[in-house]
């Protein structure tokens, strides 16, 4: 992994490829490379360690030009970050870029070495290049060669292959890692993400599992997993050209934090009428499916998992539907029992998360009554493969640490909870009206939370010399504590953990001292007195407390305990509201620490490998 761009055109494609890589930088990477065939059918390749800008300068210095090319940003999986391990990889006249993991690459490597091939990298991708070269000894068609090669591969891949002897076409293959074809006029493109191509086209074809595609300047031919020609519908992208621009903000994460009121308003739009949730807005046949639901199984990873954990409280408390939440990488590898009338819900920002996709495919074999995804990317694999897709409308999220995707997931989940409760008879009309009013107030309430930006910036100074932090919450605020800890560790590199506050006695209290900041989410609710007891446990052991609560909670700031007094909000939407100060705290601490906020080390935006 991480980013692929390909282009075939009459004009020079070097700038298109480099600009595409720039647009994919948000996904995270450690090295980059480009290969272009010139008019004399010579392969020109440049690879470098570090940022795409370094590659761009090298391409300009070497005056690389040509009408057919491929480019890649790499996030190391096999082999350390290095120029030798950077893509494209070459074997003879063939160049390959690849996202994914080839699980049987070691045996393939041994077989190829016995055939006389020498390996210049530690990557699994170089195996693909040599396999193509080997098959083409007895083959004239690159398309047929790639179709033969993919049959030998086990694992996940999204790849593009280029032949400098036949530069009039590119061949791509997709299994477990996304690829999209961009359609131009007299030119065509390939990428792992449509964002890479927004400056050259708005029309896209999303390849499906097992597809192999051959593109020329004027044609696109796609073949399914069985080698049969297929038609895939094209889609017009509604993403804006400046979707990947920071504007006046210092970082994408900062921009995305402050975009949340609008993102939630967009997510609610057209789905609420007066004080009702429009069940039909969830999708065709939604009401018929939802009224039968007796159990919810949520599967997700990372931030999306935390959103699912909040939703569990809503499903059970508000809609009276039992709900389980599981990490996708665990769910897919265990033997589970499918409950009767159970609906599977997958959560993902990208819709391409490898473990979540695998969990969906497994669950569809195990007798779930239906599969729904809550996702931010139309046309993604999760959307295409699910029975229902309830889309968030967060817009493009560039920062690796998710912000607006998380809160729009929660808003969407709450709408779904209300819809299921209504059609199953567990939520009355008056309850629905109250819940919808709370949802409609959410954008304005988040604006109020964002107004605490400067106060939280000052608070963040206390974390300048800290190496550890503990987050506490009870009930639906425990997952918000989890999200706060995740954000802090992701972008500030402070070791942060979250615990249900009632678990303090069972281990975490041993960590408490004056150097351990303890962040507590403690708004007024039925569990407040329990949380206060937990806070006293920390105070009595000399811990430094930072409590986020409303005025009615009755906290008084004392030595060793700072209070961030927040406005009182409706209890149902309060978990979403209290997410905002957690995001702001993580952001400002990361600024103080001097880390790369938008592209934290070792992390990628879309995890398309296991």
Swiss-Prot record:
Keyword Transferase attributed: yes
Cellular compartments annotated: Cytoplasm
GO cellular component, one term: cytosol
Keyword terms: Aminotransferase, Cytoplasm, Glutamine amidotransferase, Repeat, Transferase
EC number of the protein: 2.6.1.16
Principal subcellular localization: cytoplasm
Catalytic activity: D-fructose 6-phosphate + L-glutamine = D-glucosamine 6-phosphate + L-glutamate
GO biological process: carbohydrate metabolic process; fructose 6-phosphate metabolic process; protein N-linked glycosylation; UDP-N-acetylglucosamine metabolic process
Domain SIS: 285-426, 459-600
UniProt-listed HAMAP family: GlmS
Purpose: Catalyzes the first step in hexosamine metabolism, converting fructose-6P into glucosamine-6P using glutamine as a nitrogen source.
Protein name as it appears in the record: Glutamine--fructose-6-phosphate aminotransferase [isomerizing]
Gene symbol of the encoding locus: glmS
């Amino acid at each position: 992994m991480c980013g692929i761009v390909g282009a075939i055109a009459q004009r020079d494609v070097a700038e298109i490829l480099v600009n595409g890589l720039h647009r994919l930088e948000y996904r995270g990477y450690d090295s980059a490379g480009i290969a272009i065939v010139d008019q004399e059918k010579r392969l020109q390749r440049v690879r470098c360690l570090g940022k795409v800008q370094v590659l761009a300068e090298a391409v300009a210095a070497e005056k690389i030009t040509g009408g057919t090319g491929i480019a890649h940003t790499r996030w190391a999986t096999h082999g350390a970050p290095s120029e030798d391990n950077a893509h494209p990889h070459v074997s003879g006249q063939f160049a390959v870029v690849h996202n994914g993991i080839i699980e049987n690459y070691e045996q393939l490597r041994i077989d190829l070495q016995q055939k006389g091939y020498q390996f210049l990298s530690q990557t699994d991708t170089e195996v693909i290049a040599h396999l193509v070269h080997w098959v083409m000894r007895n083959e004239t068609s690159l398309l047929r060669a790639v179709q033969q090669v993919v049959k030998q591969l086990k694992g996940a891949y999204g790849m593009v292959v280029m032949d400098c002897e036949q530069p009039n076409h590119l061949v791509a293959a997709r299994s477990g890692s996304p690829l999209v074809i961009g359609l131009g006029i007299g030119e065509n493109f390939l990428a792992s993400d449509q964002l890479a191509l927004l400056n050259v086209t708005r029309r896209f074809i999303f390849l499906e599992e097992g597809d192999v595609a051959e593109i020329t300047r004027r044609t696109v031919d796609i073949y399914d997993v069985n080698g049969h020609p297929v038609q895939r519908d094209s889609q017009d992208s509604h993403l804006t050209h400046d979707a990947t621009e920071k504007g006046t903000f210092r970082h994408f994460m900062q921009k995305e934090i402050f975009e949340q009121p609008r993102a939630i308003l967009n997510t609610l739009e057209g789905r609420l009428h007066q004080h009702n949730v429009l069940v039909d807005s969830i999708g065709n046949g939604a009401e018929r499916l939802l009224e039968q639901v007796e159990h919810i199984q949520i599967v997700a990873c990372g931030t999306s998992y935390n959103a699912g954990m909040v939703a569990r409280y809503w499903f059970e408390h508000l809609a009276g539907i039992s709900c389980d939440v599981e990490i996708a990488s665990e769910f897919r590898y265990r033997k589970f029992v499918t409950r009767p009338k159970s609906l599977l819900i997958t959560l993902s920002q990208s819709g391409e998360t490898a473990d979540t996709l695998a969990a969906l495919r497994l669950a569809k074999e195990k007798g779930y009554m239906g599969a729904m995804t809550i996702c931010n990317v139309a046309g993604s694999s999760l959307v295409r493969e699910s029975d229902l897709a309830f889309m968030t409308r967060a817009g493009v999220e560039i920062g690796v640490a998710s912000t607006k995707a998380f809160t729009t997931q929660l808003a969407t989940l709450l709408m779904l909870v209300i819809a299921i409760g209504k059609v199953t008879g567990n939520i009355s009309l008056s309850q629905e009206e109250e819940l919808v009013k709370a949802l409609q107030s959410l954008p304005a309430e988040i604006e109020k939370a964002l107004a605490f930006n400067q106060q939280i910036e000052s608070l963040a100074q206390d974390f300048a010399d800290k190496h550890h932090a503990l987050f506490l919450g009870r009930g639906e605020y425990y997952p918000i504590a989890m999200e706060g800890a995740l954000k802090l560790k992701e972008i500030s590199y402070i070791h942060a953990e979250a615990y249900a506050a009632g678990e303090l006695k069972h281990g975490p209290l041993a960590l408490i001292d004056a150097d351990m900041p303890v962040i507590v989410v403690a708004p007024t609710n039925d569990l407040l007195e329990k949380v206060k007891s937990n806070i006293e446990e920390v105070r009595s052991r000399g811990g430094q407390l930072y409590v986020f609560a409303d005025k009615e909670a009755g906290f008084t700031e004392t030595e060793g305990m700072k209070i961030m007094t927040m406005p009182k909000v409706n209890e149902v939407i309060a978990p979403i509201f209290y997410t905002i100060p957690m995001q702001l705290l993580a952001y400002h601490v990361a600024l103080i620490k001097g880390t790369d906020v938008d592209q934290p080390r070792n992390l990628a935006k879309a995890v398309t490998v296991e």
